């Protein structure tokens, strides 16, 4: 007979809450800085307002009680969801009230999407351009119209009711946030029951969520889109409740519906292949993925996650224990392996958040690439403005998340890391050989930087000397990306063996025939050459530098040879005190600050590469004589020199935004100008010393005192850290808004 160890015993799922732990007090809530003893006394100097903003959401600084911190984070998540539902509701409301959605639905190839009409106050109505179908408004590039069509929405009334539903959900979220902090707040053990959490998130959110969406796609989206693709007037299409209740309508479109669920229980699942398909490629009518393929995908994903939702041990003594999995994971060269990591991930939400942000950010950038390589919604691929916007948006979101991962990993190291619990495990071993890691990474950055930039400088020099035969290019000295070409070719050929019934490979980027909708290229094979090889190595360089900065910030967050007691100074500090020169700008916060600039560098080049490559080699019109691309394939010839990037991309393509005045795109011209100003304004904070401003302020205060109009709250210059924060915020805001206006004015004009 075997007696199971205490660890083997299941962690019972139980509702563990404290009733009425914190009273609801509007008086307390209305008092600025109520969460801090110092701040709640009110302002003595202008630094107070900055500290208020810095610490309002830094729950660690309000209390050291992990349970209380967990409750605040949990409650704040509901507030965040409420705000998201309000935002989403606003999007749907604009679609219902101020858009040409129904007109677009009837002719998506000629009518452009618009859901914003500018009020005429002092002439702003110039922004309401003619988007077709007798509608004047601002052309939008969010992709909502394509998403709505894919969802099976056929009228503005449906958008209106969904918008109201969004507000109801927002109210429910705000109530839940209040209820789970003030009325029934979960105990710490509930937050730390990871097996139960994994089962619920995997099985419930991802499994049942995907199943519900697959059900919607099968019963509503597929029939509606099949009828729309066949040219049926949206007003003639049966409403969702007809499709759900009247099996005859569905059986007309998908014969297997007549058989009901018998094939499911008799395991004749292939009967359902009329609506759960495996075609591959794009629908030639809409230029989007086959919606029957995506429905099939969501059914498969649902099955996977419903299985995953039963993998972890809770009420019954079967399944995995996260702690056991981690601690059993021990390689021959890695000491204690993952021992101690379970404790870190259940007591440090910063560590948890760092991992999630890194994964989520990487996923966002992967999504950016899938949106053009495998456009998921009807008529998305031929809406070039939306394609460019979605790529840029998901790339930048990913970058911010990844820098956030570096930030929270460093905060974990400073605030939550306990060296006594981490002896010779993976984390300890990484920290002990951090010098080797960072110096190797530094060498890689130098190698990539000099070699990739060196290729460009060589080409610029040869070009200036009139020696094109000595340049690296597809027509002279070729540097073909042979591995990338091999991957493309393999992905193009493989489905013929692995999926013989598929019509095409997963994406047209691999190869095959071009798909055009309404005479515009939706997607076609993307050929890679010397120019792509060169800019790819610039991507490698900038990404490695970003990682170097963030990783150095994390690994040296607690101590360094320069400042052995860094952990005592905290996450952000300007210098190691007076009288110790050369120790400024070494805090973990400063590494995040620098990492943001390199993230911006990296991603600017990524989105520039995408924008130019697509205009040159993919996007364009199809005529009898072939494909006419927007910039006529000039990427391969011009993108191999720095001068080519400046002249044929930045300068040549900025003419639309610079000359937009007096047209419906004039707002982009003003934003372009204003955002340059915001960017330049940031330099005032980044290139200045705090003492200069303090001195200036004191002389101004002296003048006010002379006139007896001195303020009661003493003005103070921003601290070094505050100044850098304001600087980087404006640098990024200015840079992003400049790029946004440049891209949109260009692509709306020529796309």
UniProtKB/Swiss-Prot annotation:
Keywords: 4Fe-4S, Chlorophyll, Chloroplast, Chromophore, Electron transport, Iron, Iron-sulfur, Magnesium, Membrane, Metal-binding, Oxidoreductase, Photosynthesis, Photosystem I, Plastid, Thylakoid, Transmembrane, Transmembrane helix, Transport. Coiled coil: none annotated. It is a multi-pass membrane protein. Changing residue 676 to Q: Impairment of P700 function. More severe. PROSITE patterns: PHOTOSYSTEM_I_PSAAB. Chlorophyll a' binds at residue 676. Chlorophyll a binds at residues 684, 692. One of its GO terms (cellular component) is photosystem I. The keyword RNA-binding does not apply. It is an enzyme of class 1 (oxidoreductase). P700 is a chlorophyll a/chlorophyll a' dimer, A0 is one or more chlorophyll a, A1 is one or both phylloquinones and FX is a shared 4Fe-4S iron-sulfur center. It catalyses: reduced [plastocyanin] + hnu + oxidized [2Fe-2S]-[ferredoxin] = oxidized [plastocyanin] + reduced [2Fe-2S]-[ferredoxin]. The keyword Nuclease does not apply. [4Fe-4S] cluster binds at residues 575, 584. Its EC number is 1.97.1.12. The chain crosses the membrane at residues 73-96, 159-182, 198-222, 294-312, 349-372, 388-414, 436-458, 533-551, 591-612, 665-687, 725-745. Changing residue 693 to F: Unable to photoaccumulate an electron on A1. The PsaA/B heterodimer binds the P700 chlorophyll special pair and subsequent electron acceptors. PSI consists of a core antenna complex that captures photons, and an electron transfer chain that converts photonic excitation into a charge separation. The eukaryotic PSI reaction center is composed of at least 11 subunits. Belongs to the PsaA/PsaB family. HAMAP family: PSI_PsaA. This is Photosystem I P700 chlorophyll a apoprotein A1. The gene is psaA.
């Amino acid at each position: 007979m075997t007696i199971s160890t205490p660890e083997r015993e299941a962690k019972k799922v139980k509702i563990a809450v404290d009733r009425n732990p914190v009273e609801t007090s509007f008086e307390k809530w209305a008092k600025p800085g109520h969460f801090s003893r110092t701040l709640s006394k009110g302002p003595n100097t202008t630094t107070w307002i900055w500290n208020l903003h810095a610490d309002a959401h830094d729950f660690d600084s309000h209390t050291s009680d992990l349970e209380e911190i967990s409750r605040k984070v949990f409650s704040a998540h509901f507030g965040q969801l409420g705000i998201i539902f309000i935002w989403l509701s606003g999007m749907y409301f604009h679609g219902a009230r101020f858009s040409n959605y129904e007109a677009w639905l009837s002719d998506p190839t000629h009518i452009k999407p618009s859901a914003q009409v500018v009020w005429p106050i002092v002439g702003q109505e110039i922004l309401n351009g003619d988007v077709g179908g007798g509608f004047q408004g601002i052309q939008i590039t969010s992709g909502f119209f394509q998403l709505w069509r894919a969802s099976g929405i056929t009228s503005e009334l449906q958008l209106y009711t969904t918008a109201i539903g969004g507000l109801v959900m927002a109210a429910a979220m705000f109530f839940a946030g209040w209820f789970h902090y003030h009325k029934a707040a979960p105990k710490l053990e509930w937050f730390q029951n990871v097996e139960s959490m994994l089962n619920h998130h995997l099985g419930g959110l991802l499994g049942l969520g995907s199943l519900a969406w697959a059900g919607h796609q099968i019963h509503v989206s597929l029939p509606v889109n099949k009828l729309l693709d066949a040219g049926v007037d949206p007003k003639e299409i049966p409403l969702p409740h007809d499709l759900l209740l009247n099996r005859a309508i569905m059986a007309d479109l998908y014969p297997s519906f007549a058989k009901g669920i018998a094939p499911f229980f008799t395991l004749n699942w292939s009967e359902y292949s009329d609506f759960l398909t495996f075609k591959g490629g794009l629908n030639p009518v809409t230029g989007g993925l086959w919606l029957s393929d995506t429905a099939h995908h969501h059914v498969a994903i649902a099955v996977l996650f419903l299985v995953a939702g039963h993998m972890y041990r809770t009420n019954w003594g079967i399944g995995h224990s996260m702690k056991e999995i981690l601690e059993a994971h021990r390689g021959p060269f890695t000491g204690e392996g993952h021992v101690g990591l379970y404790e870190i991930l259940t007591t440090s939400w910063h560590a948890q958040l760092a991992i999630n942000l890194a994964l989520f950010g990487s996923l966002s950038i992967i999504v950016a690439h899938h949106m053009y390589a495998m456009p998921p919604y009807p008529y998305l691929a031929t809406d070039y403005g939306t394609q460019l916007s979605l790529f840029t948006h998901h790339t930048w979101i990913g970058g911010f998340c990844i820098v956030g991962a570096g930030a929270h990993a460093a905060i974990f190291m400073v605030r939550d890391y306990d060296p006594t619990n981490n002896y010779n495990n993976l984390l300890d071993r990484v920290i002990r050989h951090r010098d080797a890691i960072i110096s190797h990474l530094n060498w890689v950055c130098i190698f990539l930087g000099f070699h990739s930039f060196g290729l460009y400088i060589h080409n610029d020099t040869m070009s200036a000397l009139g020696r094109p035969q000595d340049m690296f290019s597809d027509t002279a000295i070729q540097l073909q990306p042979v591995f990338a070409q091999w991957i493309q070719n393999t992905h193009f050929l493989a489905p013929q063996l692995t999926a013989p019934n598929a019509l095409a490979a997963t994406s047209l980027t691999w190869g095959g025939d071009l798909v055009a909708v309404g005479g515009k290229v939706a997607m076609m094979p993307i050929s890679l050459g010397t120019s792509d090889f060169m800019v790819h190595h610039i991507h490698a360089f900038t990404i490695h530098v970003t990682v170097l900065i963030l990783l150095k910030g994390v690994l040296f967050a607690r101590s360094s040879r320069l400042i052995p007691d860094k952990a005592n100074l905290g996450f952000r500090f300007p210098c190691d005190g007076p009288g110790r020169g050369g120790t400024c700008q070494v805090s973990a916060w400063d590494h995040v600050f620098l990492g943001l600039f390199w993230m911006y560098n990296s991603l600017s080049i990524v989105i520039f590469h995408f924008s130019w490559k697509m205009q040159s080699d993919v996007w364009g019109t199809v005529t009898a004589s072939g494909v006419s691309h927007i910039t006529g394939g000039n990427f391969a010839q011009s993108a191999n020199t720095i001068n080519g990037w400046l002249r044929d991309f930045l300068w040549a393509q900025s003419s639309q935004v610079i000359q937009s005045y007096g047209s419906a795109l004039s707002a982009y011209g003003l934003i372009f100008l204003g955002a340059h100003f915001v960017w330049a304004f940031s330099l005032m904070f980044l290139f200045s010393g705090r003492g200069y401003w303090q001195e200036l302020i004191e002389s101004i205060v002296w003048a006010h005192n002379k006139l007896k109009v001195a303020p009661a709250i003493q003005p103070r210059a921003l601290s070094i850290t505050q100044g850098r924060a304001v600087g980087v915020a404006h640098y990024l805001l200015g840079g992003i808004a400049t790029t946004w206006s440049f891209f949109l004015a260009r692509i709306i004009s020529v796309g």
